[in-house]
């Protein structure tokens, strides 16, 4: 009888461990299946946090990206950007001396992606805007960005 209980316990333990391995593997699988052909994109814009109180950026509220907030060197809120990357406003190129840095919903990675390589709308990152070689807006990316250092070195 004791052997039967030990076998049941080991079998139960193996099932639980197997389910844990399966669930952890599923977390790393991108649910979006994209085709393998390359897109014909010219460049991409990904609004990102930029600058710091010590390393100021040169922009103004008109030219700043919608969804990004702009701050002074002492951290006071100045404005939210007014320019939509899909339809940029005609804005002056002057630097607002009050703006030191920006905070955007996404802060990792490059702001300008050029060239885009083999990126398509499907493989492009959410929150990034992709344009054709003629400069016209094509699409917003559809895939989640990979988390930085997802598999750290051991």
Curated annotation (Swiss-Prot):
Sequence repeats lie at residues 31-87, 88-147. Disulfide bonds join 34-122, 38-118, 46-128, 58-95, 61-79, 62-91, 68-104, 121-139. It holds the Pfam family Prot_inhib_II. The record marks 36-37 as: Reactive bond for chymotrypsin. Keywords: Disulfide bond, Protease inhibitor, Repeat, Serine protease inhibitor, Signal. The record marks 93-94 as: Reactive bond for trypsin. Belongs to the protease inhibitor I20 (potato type II proteinase inhibitor) family. This is Proteinase inhibitor type-2 P303.51.
